[in-house]
Amino acid sequence: MAASKNSRNSRRFKSALTSAAASVAFCALACFATMACAVWYFYRAGATLYYGDAEAHLNIARRIIDSRTPGWSQIGTTWLPLPHLLMLPFVRHERLWMTGLAGAIPAAIAMSLAAIFLFAAVRRAFGSVTAATAATAVFLLNPNTLYLGAIPMTEAYFFAALFALLYFTVRFDETRGWGALAGAAIAVCAASLTRYEGWFLIPFTAVFLLVRGKGVVRRIAGVLVFCSVASLGPAIWLAHNRFYFGDFLYFFRGPWSAAAIQGKTDYPGRDNWQMAVHYYFEAGKLAIGLPALGLGAGGAVAALYRRAFWPVLLLMLPPLFYVWSIHSSSTPVFVPTLWPNSFYNTRYAMAFLPLVAFGIGAIASFGRIPAVLAVLLAFTPVMLHPEQHSITWQESDVNSRARRQWVGEAADWLKPRMGPNETFLTSFSDLTGIYRELGVPLRNTLTGDNDVEFVMATTNPPVFLHTDWAIVLSGDDLQTLLDRARRNAPKYELVHRVTVKGEPALEIYKREDDVPELPEHDDTLP
């Protein structure tokens, strides 16, 4: 009888394992297919590189391998490096780089993995495929998720790391195993190399592992191992900033940091907790919808009832980080429904979505009818107004019109006039999109990221400045340099100007060297 009972238990275990694997495999197939369709849709709509940040992420990855000074130094200082490193296999292909697909494809893979880890985590937390399906649908089918997962932005990579951390910590809570702990450490390390809110997750996760571990010695050893791996991300970034820029915190207080960009200009929420919460919640309503936010809040209570304390705490951390950033870290969030009635950083409200999705998964764990009703209610705004673009798509469109006009007109003007392998003095900024559209290798551009060569060219132009063209914004430092250089040599003549209302003009200069004529040959000379 005992053998028969053990046999039945073994069969049940194998059956459950097979069922779990099959459900995850089906989820993976659906997620990858969904994101492939999203990439194709936004590419056909021409929206892949609407965000200026998307253009910049793509070109940072490209310049690591295609620059006058290629290598690790081209990663820069403000944005964390992992997304750019993951784009490297794709940006090597010129056509993928020129179209932006080199950044869209890895982002779509990351967003698919995020949804798969969410499915697995919710299934394990509530023991319900229905709950996992509902949570995954609410997350992946959000129009903003589809857009941000189909363009070269960092949100997809962070969501993948966050949900991997969720899965491995939920698994650790059940098994107390070293494999789950190692998975959690790798996941949070990846998060910390993707976005700064990943750093915020490390101490909370360490405390969770310490509290939920088994045995005093095993707990301490586990936390030490976790912290050793998890802290590699911040340690690498601090060392990178110290080595290349002379300051461990250059990313935080350098000229390209959020604090430097915002300066002392006031904005709603700065040093005001109530206003910070108000603006962030308003952005959340636009990005996720009020019904979904309400369901997420109710679902969080349901999750606590189901004793899923840690997942709720973990998924609350990113929204709390952003409210803190609005209040204390020079990070404004503007929405069209509140003063100054514009778009800026609205995508940060997507940090609400993991908690909302998990909460709806908790509601769905009570049965199929609650699951269907919760999912339908969450998507009510989309169903009522299917013609409206997502808030992130709107933001990227509105804020990129000047840049797209600059890039398009400049590229159209240059295409029939530039020769093969001609070189450009320029800045690594929005203007880099011109060279991407034209297929000009970034090694044919000279920018401030080329260190010694750029310094030599700008401090002694007659000797070291040899580019065929210069493309600058009116009034910037390079335009001033060209005016100064005209007094001696080389001379750059303004040949075209692109003007956009309310923006500085883009100016294209062509080098006009005075080449002295050779004397005629004199046969009488010896």
What is the meaning of each model-derived region?
Residues 4, 171-177, 201-234:
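Perimembrane helix-loop-helix junctions
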Residues 25-30, 202, 207, 227-231, ...:
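Signature aromatic-anchored transmembrane alpha helix within multi-pass, membrane-resident enzymes
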Residues 37-40, 220-298, 320-322:
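Membrane-lumen/periplasm interface segments of specific transmembrane helices
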Residues 52, 83, 102-110, 134-164, ...:
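Multi-pass, polyprenyl lipid-linked donor-dependent membrane glycosyltransferases
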Residues 105-126, 160, 164, 168, ...:
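Transmembrane-helix motifs of polytopic, lipid-linked glycan transferases
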Residues 210, 282-322, 356-359, 375:
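Hydrophobic, aromatic-rich transmembrane alpha-helices
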Residues 378-431, 521-526:
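Membrane-embedded, lumen/periplasm-facing catalytic core of multi-pass transferases
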Residues 414-447, 469-473:
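Short periplasmic/luminal acceptor-recognition loop of GT-C membrane glycosyltransferases, typified by
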